[in-house]
Amino acid sequence: PSKPVQWVFTGVCLLIVLLGFLFPFSQLVYWAIKTAHKVIDASFGMIVVKSFSLAAGSSVLIVFMAIVLLYAVRVSGMHGMRYVTRIASLGYAIPGAVIAVGIMAPVIGFDKWLLRVAPLDGKLLLSSGLFMLLFAYLVRFMAVGYNAIDTGFQKAGKDINDASRMLGFNTWHTLWKVDLPLIRKSIAAALLSVFVDVIKELPLTLILRPFNFHTLATKAFDMATNEQIAESANASLIVILTGILPVVLLNRIIRKSH
């Protein structure tokens, strides 16, 4: 195409970036700077710590479960096992609110039964803490960790696994000494991907969070609901930056792997 046509296409692409990201992001930065003295305090710092701790814990749990499931398939050699484990990763296609409602009924029912069997000062042990929320994250984001780890195992292949077994290493020693080092980039990618998804997840957290428990996403939502649009920019900005930085790291991991 001619130079004018190239400039037109370049301008259209830049316009999309400007309207879709740079202008809204600049507005958020302006609001965040303007309202920082009213919003950022010790309680806001605790919300940041809780959000990052919850996301980190959920990431480790989900990636651990993905490794266990996929290694069970890898060791068993049964093709049917792969279809069974795939069921565990269907939650990503289901809306968060639906998962939340679906989890609440059985967990609360089990909690009430547990209360009758072993009374614990009248407290609902599982549904009053973070258990339901962590379990919901596990159901919702298992596919993210599962697919990343599955890719790593497929790239590693099974030949080196078989060679390790022939040299006398047992199953778990092979996993620890051979497989995990080979898929460490996939593990890092899975951890980062799940971390970002948990940080920005709203419906699940709103429905299943314990009383008076806030994350950055719920804090931004509450402020926006109360017409504190400018004040919500601080939490929103942290969520956005938390989503951007891992993407940059993931791109570096992918480039190095190629």
Q: Where on the chain are the PLM-derived regions?
A:
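Membrane-interfacial helix termini and adjacent extracytoplasmic/periplasmic loops
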Residues: 1, 40-45, 80-81, 100-138, ...
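Periplasmic/extracellular loop-to-transmembrane helix junction in inner-membrane transport proteins
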Residues: 1-7, 25-61, 76-78, 226-227
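Cytoplasmic-entry segments and transmembrane alpha-helices of multi-pass inner-membrane transporters
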Residues: 6-10, 68-107, 161
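Hydrophobic alpha-helical transmembrane segments of polytopic membrane proteins
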Residues: 57-66, 132-136, 140, 144, ...
